[in-house]
């Protein structure tokens, strides 16, 4: 199966859900498109104000991940750096990142995909 073909649609019509694999409260996502067979998907990720992802630990993935911060900011607790709206990351498989804290909240647009 591949991602569904979609022309523009109202993103607000997609429901928010808690991030299933997260061990902490305050992370919600809207899946915009996805392919369950490959795990490739695009989503909007929301950190509620005060969210701390320390329970999730440092993350690494076996897929590529691109992240654009739409609004707000997050602090990488491992690096001790704050990243703000307008900044972008491209993470290859295996790149460690997080945990994160977002004192004022943050919204990101993310694309995850395998190399092949």
Predicted regions mapped to residue ranges:
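Ligand-binding loop in jelly-roll beta-barrel domains
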Residues: 27, 93-116
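A short, N-terminal "cap"/entry segment at the start of jelly-roll beta-barrel domains
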Residues: 1-41
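Glycine- and acidic-residue-biased ligand/ion/polar-headgroup-sensing regions
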Residues: 55-77
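Conserved short histidine dyad/triad with adjacent acidic residue
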Residues: 30-61, 80, 92-96
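Short, well-ordered beta-strand segments in beta-rich or mixed alpha/beta enzyme
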Residues: 45-47, 68-74, 107-109
């Amino acid at each position: 199966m591949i991602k569904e073909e979609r022309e523009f649609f109202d993103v607000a019509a997609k429901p928010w859900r808690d991030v299933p694999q997260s061990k902490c409260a305050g992370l919600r996502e809207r899946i915009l498109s996805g392919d369950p067979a490959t795990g490739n998907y695009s989503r909007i990720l929301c950190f509620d104000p005060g969210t701390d992802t320390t329970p999730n630990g440092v993350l690494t993935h076996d897929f590529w991940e691109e992240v654009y911060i739409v609004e707000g900011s997050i602090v990488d607790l491992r690096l001790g750096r704050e990243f703000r709206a307008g900044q972008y990351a491209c993470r290859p498989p295996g790149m460690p990142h997080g945990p994160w804290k977002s004192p004022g909240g943050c919204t990101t647009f993310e694309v995850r995909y395998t190399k092949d």
